[in-house]
Amino acid sequence: MPVSLDGKLVVAISSRAVFDFEEENRVFERDDDAAYMALQRERLEQPAPPGVAGALVKKLVAFDGPAGTEAQRRVEVVVVSRNDPVSGLRVFRSARHAGLRLERGVFTRGRTPWPYLTPLKANLFLSANSDDVRAALDAGFPAARVF
């Protein structure tokens, strides 16, 4: 049976808000997506440092306590990112290393992430990208830029 997100606080958050991928992002902006993906693949086993919303995510996932089963959880943090799937692997490995319960993610490989907010039943979208926040707000979703 699929997991239901009904009745939960679902916070969708970008990977750059959770983890500090600013150096990698500069490679993407300076070079191209192939160089960016190669760098992320090269650093796959290197946990990323916390991003601007790292402490917030830690508090959100700790809200249910360590013993909360999937059915008992009231808060779900979902990564919604323009990143590619290889970078997604690094996100989840970094989360595991940091002790963060991040189990779901959407990696759009450059496409805008806000269309995924409805299927995820997201109550809030947080991102370090002001354009993505503006697009989500324009589409009627509660959103905020974290910095």
Where are these regions (language model features)?
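HAD-like aspartate-dependent phosphatase fold
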Residues: M1-F147
